[in-house]
Swiss-Prot record:
It comes from Postia placenta (strain ATCC 44394 / Madison 698-R). The keyword Amino-acid biosynthesis does not apply. GO terms for cellular component: cytosolic small ribosomal subunit. Pfam families: 40S_SA_C, Ribosomal_S2. Disulfide bonds: none annotated. This is Small ribosomal subunit protein uS2.
Length: 297
């Protein structure tokens, strides 16, 4: 695989294996005439195979364009395709760009009255066919466009096309991850080593909401089962049977500890009779005269 890039920017065997494992080289049966230079061959079943070498060259070229912009916030990354929502949000969080995940509000680049109005210097889209509204508005206000393009993608108003499979969740996540890593390397934020960036590519992959909810339920059930097991294994609190009994009562444990026999037929010790006619032991003082003026007058 011949490459026109300098040796320091060339793809390593590990990066080529990542692209192949994510099926970034698998195109579609349809092919646009402007995407023909990026096609390597066509399989017997009609699927077009992309040239991985040209994919890497255009990826590095796009990263150099993004790194040349002084303010990272002037870059806007867009994905209306659900598989790219998490990828663009992670890219924006790591590089400082603006992210539009989901529906693109018409007029965001042309109508300054709208609340979502933006003036970026560059936009990066996941699919030119799905993000056509953003590309068209960018053409009205002279904003350059970088796009991940499949073999059937229209290249109208697209300035830099990165040929890749933009319909697979793993391919989209990998391409955004590689682009973010290359931008950070060119900015000097991370070193150009294999372990220079500790963000895993899995963080950029799309996750099904039902799958996430199921995983959270399984984790909650596992925590509940672990808590129930700990509660079952914990020893019960033992009462101190050797403590002194309450007044008028008998402590069987204390009697057994002293070696005596407990006579259950014996009558309990009765308290003395209560004389309700006796005077109270302490004076309440309700009838006493006040010692000093109260100050109410």
């Amino acid at each position: 695989m011949s490459s026109k890039l300098p040796s320091v920017l060339s793809a390593t065997d590990e990066e080529i294996q990542l692209l192949l494992a994510a099926q970034a080289h698998i195109g579609s049966k349809n092919c646009d005439k402007q995407m023909l230079p990026y096609v390597w061959k066509r399989r017997a079943d009609g699927i077009h195979i992309l040239n991985i070498g040209k994919t890497w060259e255009k990826l590095v070229f796009a990263a150099r364009i993004i790194a040349a912009i002084e303010n990272p916030n002037d870059v806007c990354v867009i994905s209306a395709r659900p598989y790219g929502h998490r990828a663009v949000l992670k890219y924006a969080a790591n590089t400082g760009a603006q992210a539009i995940a989901g529906r693109f509000t018409p007029g965001s680049f042309t109508n300054y009255i709208t609340r979502s109005f933006k003036e970026p210097r560059l936009i990066v889209v996941t699919d030119p066919r799905v993000d056509h509204q953003a590309i068209r508005e960018a053409s009205y206000v002279n904003i350059p466009v970088i796009a991940f393009c499949d073999t059937d993608a229209p290249l109208k108003f697209v300035d830099v096309a990165i040929p890749t499979n933009n319909k697979s969740r793993h391919s989209i996540g990998l391409m955004w991850w590689l682009l973010a890593r290359e931008v950070l390397r060119l900015r000097g934020t991370i070193p150009r080593t294999t372990d220079g960036w500790n963000v895993m590519v899995d963080m950029f992959f799309y996750r099904d909401p039902e799958e996430v909810e199921k995983q959270q339920q399984e984790e909650a059930q596992a925590k509940a089962a672990a808590a129930a097991g700990e509660a079952a294994e914990a020893p019960l609190n033992e009462w101190d049977v050797t403590a002194a009994p309450a007044a008028g009562g008998i402590n069987p444990g204390l009697v057994a500890a002293e070696g005596g026999a407990l006579d259950w037929s014996a009558e309990p010790a009765a308290a003395g009779p209560t004389d309700w006619a006796a005077e109270p032991t302490g004076a309440s003082g309700w009838g006493a005269e006040p010692t000093g003026p109260s100050g109410w007058d």
